[in-house]
Amino acid sequence: MPSSNNKDNFLDKAFTVIAEGIVKMMPIAAKEKQAYIYYREGFAAQNNGDYSEALENYEESLKLEENAIDRGETLKNMAIIYMSNGDEDKALDTYQKALEQNPKQPSCLKNMGLIYEKRGRALQQNGKQDESDIWFDKAAEVWTKAVRLYPGGYLDIENWLKTTGRSKVDIYL
């Protein structure tokens, strides 16, 4: 096992060196390059499970990044961390900010729907059907948008929309 870890570590380092070289050669402003470096470091930390470091790097990237699509991607990754940590309200708020930057992110809508649907199920299990329906309707609303942005990409969601009678889309493909 140690040799595999050494090999992976070598590949990570090699990739980092190559990526840094590419970033240096990119014909973009220094500020944008630094934003990308922070984003890349945040993404690496997130993949390694170091969410605190990831969030710090993403915050620094957002201070420098001006491109709305890139800002949206950074915010989406931050929301994923909040969701993983169980901070659903902060995740929802951050997904919304990501969508304000780039409204064509179906994964943000999908994840928001997961939170809404989870809340609906919890209320339903406690016998609060009227309250649960509010959350299920919210899930249906964002999931319908996600399905329209990514037809055929979320078959489980399409099935949920159809089986719950909340489908407002006749044809998904």
UniProtKB/Swiss-Prot annotation:
The keyword Thylakoid applies. One of its GO terms (cellular component) is plasma membrane-derived thylakoid membrane. TPR repeats lie at residues 35-68, 72-105, 120-153. Coiled coil: none annotated. Pfam families: TPR_12 (PF13424). SUPFAM superfamilies: TPR-like (SSF48452). GO terms for biological process: photosynthesis. Gene3D superfamilies: Tetratricopeptide repeat domain. It is a peripheral membrane protein. It is found in: Cellular thylakoid membrane. SMART domains: TPR (SM00028). Keywords: Membrane, Photosynthesis, Repeat, Thylakoid, TPR repeat. HAMAP family: Ycf3 (MF_00439). NCBIfam families: PRK02603.1. Essential for the assembly of the photosystem I (PSI) complex. May act as a chaperone-like factor to guide the assembly of the PSI subunits. Belongs to the Ycf3 family. This is Photosystem I assembly protein Ycf3. It comes from Prochlorococcus marinus (strain SARG / CCMP1375 / SS120).
